[in-house]
């Protein structure tokens, strides 16, 4: 689910005219942080643009549907 979420973020950023190098912050919600943090973080580390790590917060939360394991809120800017 993390990869699908990041793919969606890439698509939405492109539609807005920006990309992941312009992400300022990300809030990550995990259904079970103890179980899923390491796997999510490995996918995140492979995805994030080198030299452009945004501020990031990761919390455990009850998500909107039982089968959802990860949700992300992204704040990005448009390039000049």
Residue ranges and their predicted role:
Residues 1-80:
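Short, polar/acidic, helix-capping and beta-turn segments at strand->helix junctions
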């Amino acid at each position: 689910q993390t990869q699908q979420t990041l793919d969606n973020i890439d698509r939405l950023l492109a539609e807005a005219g920006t990309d992941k190098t312009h992400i300022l912050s990300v809030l990550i919600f995990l259904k079970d942080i103890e179980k899923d943090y390491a796997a999510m973080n490995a996918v995140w580390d492979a995805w994030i643009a080198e030299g452009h790590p945004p501020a990031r917060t990761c919390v455990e939360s009850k998500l909107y549907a039982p089968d959802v394991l990860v949700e992300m809120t992204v704040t990005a800017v448009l390039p000049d």
